[in-house]
């Protein structure tokens, strides 16, 4: 069991007054941030040698940790905006778990254009694209905060609209197994490593873009012949339709490892 605190990490300085054409958003970088790691590690090793000269060994280790930002100059409470639709900010905030994934509740696809029309009467989805572009096979975003529209609000801790923490990309468990054997001066060894309980947001160009779509899993997309498809309908990657369906973190396309 351990705790490690890393101080004087690089973070933004105080905002520069808006004088002489310098924007308050243009902040210098200084050593003023702090990160705290807490975790544990378990390791077991067995080594033996037989009378015939054959030796062997096996080892196993597993560890878990959580890294939390305890000091960071972000008085506005701006959120990390990877694939959320928020502009600009790529910072952290105090209390943030490293690796956290913010996204939208969206578990289903629209099954019919009638469903699209009925839903758009109740929920405004114009943050993603105009109402006339929505069709069956598009991602169905949920109005999580109940205000009649889906958007990220002001993108802050105090007002993040329908954005919420949907997962974390940091592995909860990391483990390894090592094997070794030896006989008369010859030795062989093997090492296996892995992680468990980790999320991955399948948004942006990482998996669903252009020439990257060459796995058989990409064939499981929504169509009239495949209404139960996992992926949304096929669209041009240069359009708002693509961005709305594949450009945002959603619960539907949050993968678990």
Predicted features along the sequence, with ranges:
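Outer/extracellular conduits and scaffolds centered on Gram-negative outer-membrane beta-barrels
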Residues: 1-257
């Amino acid at each position: 069991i351990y705790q490690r605190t890393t101080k004087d990490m690089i973070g933004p300085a105080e905002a520069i007054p808006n004088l002489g054409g310098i924007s308050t958003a243009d902040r210098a970088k200084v050593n003023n941030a702090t990160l705290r790691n807490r975790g544990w590690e378990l390791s077991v090793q067995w080594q033996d040698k037989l009378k015939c000269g054959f030796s062997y060994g096996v080892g196993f280790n597993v560890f878990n940790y959580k890294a939390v930002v305890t000091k960071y100059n972000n008085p506005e409470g701006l959120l990390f905006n990877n694939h959320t639709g928020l502009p600009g900010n790529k910072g952290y905030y105090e209390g943030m778990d490293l690796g956290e994934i913010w996204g939208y509740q969206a578990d289903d696809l629209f099954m019919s254009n009638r469903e699209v029309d009925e839903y758009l009467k109740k929920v405004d989805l114009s943050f993603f694209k105009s109402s006339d572009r929505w069709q069956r096979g598009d991602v169905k975003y949920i109005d999580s905060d109940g205000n009649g529209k889906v958007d990220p609000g002001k993108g802050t801790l105090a007002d993040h609209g329908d954005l919420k923490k949907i997962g974390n990309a940091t592995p909860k468990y990391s483990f390894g197994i090592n094997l070794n054997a030896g006989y008369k001066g010859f030795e062989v060894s093997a090492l296996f490593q892995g992680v468990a309980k980790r999320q991955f947001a399948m948004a942006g160009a990482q998996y669903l873009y252009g020439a990257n779509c060459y796995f058989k899993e990409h064939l499981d997309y929504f169509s009239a012949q495949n209404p139960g498809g996992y992926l949304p309908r096929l669209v041009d990657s240069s359009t708002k339709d693509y961005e709305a369906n594949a450009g945002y973190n959603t619960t539907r396309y949050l993968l678990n490892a």
